[in-house]
Amino acid sequence: MEFAERRHAGCLIRVGREARGWRQSDLGMRLACSQSTVSRLEQGRSLDLPLLKQAADLVGVPGPLLNTSLGLSSSPAPTVVVDRTPAQEDPMRRRPLITAAALAVPLSLMTRLESALAATPEPSGAPARTLDARLAAARGQFDAAAHAGLLRSLPSLLADAHQGASETRRDLDYARLSSAYTIASQLLNKLGQYKQSRLTADRATLYADVSGSPLAAAAATRELAAVLRHQGQEAAAQAHIEAAVARVEATGLATEAQAAAFAQMLCSTAYTAAIAGDRDQALVMIREAARAARDLPDAAPAGRLFPITPAAVDLYAVGVHWALGDAGTALEAGRNLHADQFPTIERKGRMHTDLARAWWQRAKPDQTVGELLSAARLAPGEVRDRPAIRQIVDDLYAKHPHVSGVRELVAVTAA
């Protein structure tokens, strides 16, 4: 927040530009202006406010941060005051307040990450040799649905990954930086923070391309496609994911890790096609994914970038058929799935929420509640933190308040 508080809007633009790896001429090309104009913007010698706002949007400076730097914030940041009357403690009464907030993690953590995306923080000072372990720990937090903890650790992880890449300029360190942004994008997408997720996915893709690693590029592209789907850009998502499939296939699929990446990208292609309403493509791709995963182990080795398994493909099939509106087929695809087939809390919870969506699509509130309760008991964050799942809980309470378990679900989402 230092640049914002000191009214250095141009510095925010510069930091955001450099974080994307752009030169002033690169930003100028996107703004349809000259390099010298960009230079004046960054030095604070231009009064072109619309151009400044356009530049800020391109390089990912959050709007509130830019407004503060321009002195346009007329009031301090809002604070939350909790009225602790007995009625307020009833989760049913608290629910509208939670829904209005639309953010199930501490706002301070999200603001801190947004600031880190606008201006990369100073490195933490942790030894460079620990970065791989910290990336693994971050993936572990995501897998454990520990969303707040991961939000807390991401700013320093991104800062140190940036430092490593800038010091060595090695392909491996750019791949590590891409991985850090990929993890950030995964989390932000799950939390429904799609603008920030798009920014981090773009950066993950950029640094993966610099690294030359087809697997890092596939991971980044998968997240980019996911956020594009949420933004209603299904055609762009499909184009990105199909290009990534081709790049992975071009490796020759000589290793199990490459074969797993290929199966994962086919699953992502199938789901993207289903969201776009391309039934034929979706069904062909999910069948291809099942074939590609046929020889993969039932339990992926620890640390694998794409820990896809035959059961995981079946879970994707549930999502594909749900997206196509075929709830019965989705439930049939998931008939033999059980939580023990999935190694992480996040995946166990996701299995139950995906089945819940299918039951809800089939207008079966009792079964929907049962699956959501199973998810909440394993991974509360999968129910509490995901906007789409919270919406199902809201709808259950509005339409079926007397179904057994609804009050328990509301209490989980209001926690």
Name each model-derived stretch.
Residues 61-75, 313:
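Short C-terminal boundary/hinge segments that cap the last helix of small helical domains
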Residues 14, 25, 53, 95:
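Residues within the helices of the helix-turn-helix
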Residues 20-40:
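Short alpha-helical DNA-recognition segment
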Residues 121-415:
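Conserved binding/catalytic microenvironments
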Residues 1-19:
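A short, Lys/Arg-rich alpha-helix, primarily the initiator
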